[in-house]
């Protein structure tokens, strides 16, 4: 039985999260601090890393490819689509820059929170 992991916000206080994001933004001016967590009812495998430091000029499609590299299931890449949601219910266009998403949706702590989910787009296994 797998243990449920704490969300990043549950794990760290607001003050600690602000401090972490501020240090990141000061050190890496062209990078965005992003927290990626699996949607609660998703059938997509868990991710082996939550914190990402993404280039501000990266588009959402490229960020999805980066997330795929960190899924705990190697078969997932070929069988399922991944959908990213900002603020739990906003699905950004695939060509949108992470910088514009960050500017519009960053949390008060300085991180952009993205959750991912998926669905099987190729039917059942043969």
Swiss-Prot record:
GO terms for biological process: autophagosome assembly; autophagosome maturation; cellular response to nitrogen starvation; mitophagy; response to bacterium. It is a lipid-anchor. It is found in: Membrane. Keywords: Lipoprotein, Membrane. InterPro entries: Atg8-like (IPR004241), Ubiquitin-like_domsf (IPR029071). Residues 124-126 form a propeptide. Pfam families: ATG8. A lipid is attached at residue 123 (Phosphatidylethanolamine amidated glycine). This is Autophagy-related protein 8-like protein DDB_G0290491. It comes from Dictyostelium discoideum. GO terms for cellular component: autophagosome; autophagosome membrane. One of its GO terms (molecular function) is phosphatidylethanolamine binding. PANTHER family: MICROTUBULE-ASSOCIATED PROTEINS 1A/1B LIGHT CHAIN 3-RELATED (PTHR10969). Disulfide bonds: none annotated. Belongs to the ATG8 family.
